[in-house]
């Protein structure tokens, strides 16, 4: 966090709001900053060169000042309570819990309103109604289920409606082009010309001898390459141009209405020189309805016609290659306060010889299940892991001294802290908030040995100059929250399941208690918190768990209709945890940051059409990007909780108390995803899955061992989309599965070069975290996928770390210089 962060919070917090609304910390803080917050147009537009990224959103206060207090005038605040929690009982903290009116629909319903305006509207609603509003109502998935895991006829009806809509849209799509342009001459020859133009229209085609590209410097000193896409239409039809994704190697490009383009390379390529490519879709559809010969008639055959004749003769894909000549004087540094880090999670890395096992988690039970092991649905057990539970001291030393890091992201295992249920701790008497007496009751239930262990880990990190980032929940759940072997048959059959994880309506509240407890216990050591890790990713692996096709994660069922319930409950849990952490972590652990800087980590996969001319592929990519990359930030930043999973902003889906519950957005990127479209969503409950991803061959130099394409352009794309939410970003995971360490060095240099370029052009990115520090248990895939900068030697008692020299040299070369060294660019940037 920046030095300016606390000053900004202090300057912008309205003391009147803090005094009048004592228990609504973050909402009151935001209410005091709405009028003075800079508008979106005042923010550096990181997506100015990317026409398909939303308008930059209004930035919000990333920290959140502590404005809590007791309504009877005593010092019973969370801050005061935390100071005495370990030594003497203190009166419970009083809390005035208020509800918030819905966001004004005049702003929400407008397609032109930015997300920042919607967020500001939500914040104003908080301030205006805090004293008089009724109780907060959390979002609820509309259904006809008698219990959360029952089958729901509504899902089937919604699916049928979607199928019909998809087919009807496909039938009428050709006619949306509008009436054809009239012939210039109404005489007989004009009529014949019209017939030819309408039924034998020419497809846009590349120019035989396009103009050469030109490199120049702008008045701001930016390197740009200009040229023309080089496509013509023999009929003189108007052409439109759409850039697909981002340039492959991290640059930006815009294309004008006449096909002229302006390409800007990322700073590293501008300094060294090299090549980049980008893809443009060119179409003559705007000229009106016409047919491109006999095959063009296939456009009137819904869905199948697009499969047989992609584009229908209207659209072509054009790939442009640009060459950049080096320019001297390009700044390749990072800000002094930039966070460089590595990461691992508890379940994945703690286990190993000499480490105590944690049999109380759902994942431990899942990977030890004899049936799962017999069927090959799991690939490893934590007992064979790298033993981070006992090697944390030496790992911290390596991260600091050999890798040059200043941050280490870890997870604290819920099942280690609370192996038994905390349901008996009732927080309903405080209207759903956690009080000091609740925390003391939780403390009596906690495993104090594990509490002390994690404090020792945090102490070791700080002793080695590493700032901790703590993930509150990194997928795993205690068995009393989720017993996958009991839940699997019950959920699959639609029967009530007592411990169904995030499908249970009680899980968000239990998670709130856990988050509050961690903040209370470790707030003096931790400022940076991630509530949940990759909340959308398990939707596929848990509820479309097709054996040997999709990785099977607990509970491993075929119940896609439950996806929305899973997501909504996680969103509710995140919001509750966000408020709880801000309430109980009021101690600044690092000199320059806020007491609590809270976000969530979000896996983002940019989908691209496998063939941009194929409308079905485009639809599949668009649906994926909207749901997978946007659902969760829409819910907890904008307050739009798409409870019915239809992608439509309905009046009842905006919840002001859910909005602006992020101080930073953690971005996790590994690679991109080409999509082959179906034209319909074949799986009921999964409207985002309108096609299937195309994997690459691991033999390719730009393909990971996970068979996923790796391209810096995809990294830029997701970072620009994430930045459009107006929150600071933190890259909380970026890495590649590469067992022989031949692809990882280039991956690191080129992806970090994208980060440097974005930061230099104004994007607020606080840090970069590589996943992972050491090879670990990659969930159902076992130990086959190796992401680590180190391996571990199981033949040594201390599980000695085995370095991967090329990757360590590349990453430490960047972190220790806080810049992109020339020698690394020469070695790894594409020619």
Language-model-derived ranges and their functions:
Residues 245-324:
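Acidic, turn/loop-rich segments in luminal/extracellular domains of secretory-pathway
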Residues 330-365, 370, 451-742, 753-831:
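Active-site region of glycoside hydrolase catalytic domains
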Residues 392-477, 571-582, 594-596:
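Aromatic-lined substrate-binding rim segments of carbohydrate-active enzymes
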Residues 1-207, 289-315, 830-831:
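Composition-driven, intrinsically disordered low-complexity tracts enriched in small residues
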Residues 200-209, 321-332, 831:
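Low-complexity, Pro/Thr/Ser/Gly/Ala-rich linker/spacer regions in secreted
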Residues 359-401:
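Aromatic- and Gly/Pro-rich amphipathic surface segment
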Residues 292-301, 424-440, 487-495:
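Intrinsically disordered, low-complexity domain-flanking/linker segments in eukaryotic proteins
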């Amino acid at each position: 966090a920046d030095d300016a962060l606390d000053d900004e919070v202090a300057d912008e917090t309205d003391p009147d709001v803090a005094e009048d609304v004592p228990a609504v910390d973050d909402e009151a803080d935001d209410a005091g900053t709405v009028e003075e917050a800079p508008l979106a147009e005042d923010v550096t537009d990181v997506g100015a060169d990317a026409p398909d990224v939303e308008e930059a959103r209004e930035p919000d206060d990333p920290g959140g000042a502590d404005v809590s207090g007791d309504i009877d005038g005593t010092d019973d605040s969370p801050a005061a309570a935390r100071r005495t929690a370990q030594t003497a009982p203190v009166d419970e903290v009083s809390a005035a819990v208020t509800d918030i009116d819905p966001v004004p629909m005049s702003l929400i319903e407008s397609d032109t309103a930015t997300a920042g305006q919607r967020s500001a509207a939500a914040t104003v609603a908080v301030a205006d109604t805090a004293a008089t509003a009724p109780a907060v109502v959390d979002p609820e998935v509309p259904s006809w289920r008698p219990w959360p895991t029952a089958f729901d006829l509504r899902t089937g009806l919604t699916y049928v409606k979607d199928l019909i809509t998809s087919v009807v849209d496909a039938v009428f799509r050709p006619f949306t082009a509008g009436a054809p342009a009239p012939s210039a001459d109404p005489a007989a020859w004009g009529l014949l010309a019209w017939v030819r133009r309408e039924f034998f229209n020419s497809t846009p085609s590349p120019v035989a001898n396009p103009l050469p590209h030109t490199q120049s410097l702008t008045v701001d000193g930016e390197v740009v390459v200009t040229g023309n896409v080089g496509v013509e239409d023999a009929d003189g039809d108007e052409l439109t141009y759409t850039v697909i994704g981002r340039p492959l190697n991290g640059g930006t490009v815009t294309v004008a209405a006449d096909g002229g383009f302006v390409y800007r390379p990322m700073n590293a390529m501008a300094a060294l020189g090299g090549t980049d490519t980008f893809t443009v879709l060119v179409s003559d559809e705007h000229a009106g309805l016409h047919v491109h010969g006999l095959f063009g008639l296939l456009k009137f055959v819904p869905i199948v016609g697009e499969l047989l004749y992609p584009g229908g003769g209207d659209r072509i894909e054009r790939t442009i290659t640009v060459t950049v000549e080096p320019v001297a004087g390009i700044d390749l540094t990072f800000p002094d306060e930039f966070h460089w880090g590595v990461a691992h999670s508890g379940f994945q890395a703690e286990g190993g010889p000499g480490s105590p096992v944690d049999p109380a988690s759902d994942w431990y039970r899942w990977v030890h299940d004899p049936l799962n092991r017999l069927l090959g649905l799991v690939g490893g057990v934590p007992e064979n892991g790298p033993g981070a539970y006992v090697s944390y001291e030496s790992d911290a030393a390596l991260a600091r001294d050999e890798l040059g890091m200043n941050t280490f992201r870890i997870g604290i295992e819920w099942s280690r802290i609370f192996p038994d249920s905390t349901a008996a701790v009732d927080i309903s008497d405080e209207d759903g908030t956690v009080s000091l007496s609740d925390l003391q009751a939780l403390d009596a239930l906690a495993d104090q040995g594990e509490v002390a262990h994690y404090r020792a880990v945090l102490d070791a990190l700080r002793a080695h100059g590493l700032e901790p980032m703590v993930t509150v929940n990194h997928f795993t759940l205690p068995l009393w929250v989720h017993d996958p072997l009991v839940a699997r048959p019950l959920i699959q059959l639609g029967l009530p399941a007592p411990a169904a994880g995030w499908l249970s309506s009680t899980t968000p509240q239990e998670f709130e208690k856990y988050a509050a407890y961690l903040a209370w216990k470790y707030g003096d050591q931790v400022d940076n918190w991630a509530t949940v890790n990759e909340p959308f990713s398990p939707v596929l692996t848990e509820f479309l768990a097709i054996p040997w096709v999709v990785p099977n994660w607990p509970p491993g069922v075929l119940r896609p209709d439950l996806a929305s319930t899973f997501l909504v409950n996680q969103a509710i849990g995140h919001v509750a945890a966000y408020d709880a952490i801000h309430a109980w972590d009021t101690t600044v652990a690092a000199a320059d940051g806020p007491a609590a800087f809270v976000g969530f980590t979000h896996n983002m996969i940019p989908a691209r059409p496998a063939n941009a001319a194929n409308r079905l592929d485009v639809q599949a990519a668009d649906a994926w990007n909207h749901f997978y990359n946007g659902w969760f930030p829409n819910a907890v930043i904008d307050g739009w909780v798409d409870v019915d999973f239809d992608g439509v902003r309905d009046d009842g889906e905006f919840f002001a108390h859910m909005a602006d519950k992020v101080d930073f957005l953690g971005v996790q990127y590994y690679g991109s995803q080409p999509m082959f479209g179906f034209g319909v969503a074949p799986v009921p409950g999964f409207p985002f899955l309108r096609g299937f991803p195309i994997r690459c061959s691991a033999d390719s130099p730009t393909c990971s061992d996970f068979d996923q394409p790796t391209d810096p352009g995809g990294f830029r794309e997701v970072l620009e989309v994430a930045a459009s939410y107006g929150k600071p970003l933190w890259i909380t995971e970026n890495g590649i599965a590469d067992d022989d360490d031949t692809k990882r060095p280039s991956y690191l240099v080129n992806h970090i070069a994208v980060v440097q370029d974005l930061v230099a052009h104004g994007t607020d990115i606080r840090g970069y975290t590589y996943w992972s520090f050491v090879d670990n248990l990659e969930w159902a895939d076992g130990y086959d996928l190796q992401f680590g900068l180190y391996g571990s030697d199981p033949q040594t008692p201390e599980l000695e770390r085995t370095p991967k020299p090329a990757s360590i040299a590349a990453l430490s070369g960047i972190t220790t210089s806080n810049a992109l060294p020339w020698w690394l660019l020469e070695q790894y940037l594409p020619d």
